[in-house]
Amino acid sequence: MCIRDSIYHIDETAGRIIQASFCGVSDVCGTAHLPMIPGHTVSTFAIRFHAFGAYAFADDALRGTLNGFESPEVRFGRLDRALRARLPELRGLSARTAYAQSVLLAFQCRENPLVETAADALLYHRGTATVSEWAHELFISSRQLERLLGEYWGLSPKKGSALVRYQALYQEICHGTLTDVQDAVARYGFADQAHLCREFRRYHGENVSRFFKTSCENGRTMEENGVYPPEEAST
């Protein structure tokens, strides 16, 4: 959800990149498919950005990237060129990861303290603050917040709040710290149970009541995959 991926599909047999894409923050459920070439070995290498920090590596604003799917060169031209130049010739995930990390450290150049503070406030409130309350904490207007997040995150404040609220709710259910739908309605500021159910199904594709019943299993899966609550996530 609140992530962005730069994905490279590499034809190991021919030693070339056959497809590259940048996927923006998504608020819908979907699937991805690995391109196949008969008789060739195809691998995938990807860089996953936190939605609130990807702007540091971008050459251009991220406005319009919500649910977007485009070539990495459109927003990350310098990074894309550096990765394309070396990824096919490097062998193994460790070598490619080390190279990608060195490139990212060299190219991280954009910083905006206000954007970082906005991310901290969003995560602290778990997406439950209104846009006006959020803007007030940053000492800016709601309109300024709208422009700021549109440029740096490619999201509206309302959309960013909705996604973080969903993820916080999801993780609380999985960790077993929230076990009742009505408690969830009150804690996360939903208008009523129907509102919560609509929002959860929109992002998760499953009924929230059913999800509560399988929370123990989901909690074990999260622990195995190293998924952490919002307050532990870094921007």
Regions found by a protein language model. Name each.
Residues 1:
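Sequence context surrounding c-type heme c attachment/ligation sites in exported
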Residues 4-119, 123-132, 138-142, 155-156, ...:
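Alpha-helical bundle regulatory/interaction domains
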Residues 162:
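Short, conserved glycine- and acidic-residue-centered signature motifs
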Residues 5-9, 147, 198:
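A broad, structural surface signal
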Residues 149-155, 199-209:
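A secondary-structure capping/hinge motif
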